[in-house]
Amino acid sequence: MLNMADGAIGYLEDDGENHKIFSVIAKALKNGGKHFMNIMNGSYAQTHFPCKLWDAGEKGLTLSAFEWEKDRKTLIYGQVDYMYGEALYKPEMKEGNPIRLYSLDEITEIFCKLGLRICNSFADFSGKPSSDNDIQLMIYSIRE
């Protein structure tokens, strides 16, 4: 089973909704079944958010705001896109999307209760080991 960034898992607003999805993963896998997911790292958010970033893409500029609700471990994400060649206006990010982020320790605890064992974790597709200083958290697990 494969779950990549911008998918449903790890991108829902609260623990209840995410736990429903985690349970579906566990039930869908046979013993020995493998799961790989790519989520934003909650440990990174604890020390690096709030922040604002910009990304110059091929067709436009994206301004992103990352706010952090520490008590809920929830990212409030907003963005504004500007297409090259169009007039700029003052960015207003009225409402952001709330996303509950998890640390590797939290995912390990949740998965353990569901019969999933974490085999490895990475920070990117090169195989770099995960750390609290990397925004991506890729987790490889097996159903036991």
Over which residues does each language-model region extend?
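Short, hinge-like loop/turn segments at secondary-structure boundaries
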Residues: 2, 52-56, 137-138
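Short, glycine/charged-enriched secondary-structure capping and boundary segments
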Residues: 16-19, 50-52
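A short SAM/SAH-binding and catalytic strip from SAM-dependent methyltransferases
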Residues: 1-17
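Short catalytic/ligand-binding loop motif for oxyanion handling, primarily in non-cytosolic enzymes
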Residues: 10-12, 43-47, 130
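C-terminal lobe and adjacent flexible extensions of AdoMet/dcAdoMet transferase-like proteins
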Residues: 98-144
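SAM-dependent methyltransferase
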Residues: 36-108
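A short glycine-rich, Lys/Arg-flanked "PGG" loop and its adjoining helix->strand segment in the class I
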Residues: 18-31
